[in-house]
Amino acid sequence: MKILSVFLFVFSIYIFGHVSGTGIRIVNELKSHKNLWMRCYSKNDVIGPKIIPVGYDYVNSFRANIWGTTRFMCTLKQRPNYRHYQNFTAFKQYTAYDNGADWDWRAREDGIYLKKEGGLKKSVDMNKVYDWIN
């Protein structure tokens, strides 16, 4: 009976994480009609490359794993010549209980901004996280 109780507890945590929203959103807020080149990957998935026009976004919802190790890495590049770019961790699960977080990224002229909602860690208001690499 104890094993069944433990199984049901772990299973309910796992299911809860898959019911709530977990994902990344990347928004192109660049000026001068600059498209944004994007490619993201995790241990199991590759997204892109994709081109995001100014004013548009790309949303990827996914399921965080039960081990608490889900991570997405992304590369963003500004068009037309791709001189300005950045490689970064776009989503990181901190524990097996850390499900349901949305990481909202904004590509702007002066850098890349992040707003986090949900998950175990405190929500984060929009703030600049990365500068562009030249």
From Swiss-Prot:
Pfam families given in the database record: Self-incomp_S1
Gene Ontology cellular-component terms listed: extracellular region
InterPro entries, A to Z: Self-incomp_S1
Signal sequence, renumbered to the chain: 1-21
Main location: secreted
Locations listed in the record: Secreted
Keyword terms of this UniProt record: Glycoprotein, Secreted, Self-incompatibility, Signal
Glycosylation sites recorded in the entry for this protein: N87
Biological process, per Gene Ontology: rejection of self pollen
Family: Belongs to the plant self-incompatibility (S1) protein family.
Name used for this protein in its record: S-protein homolog 31
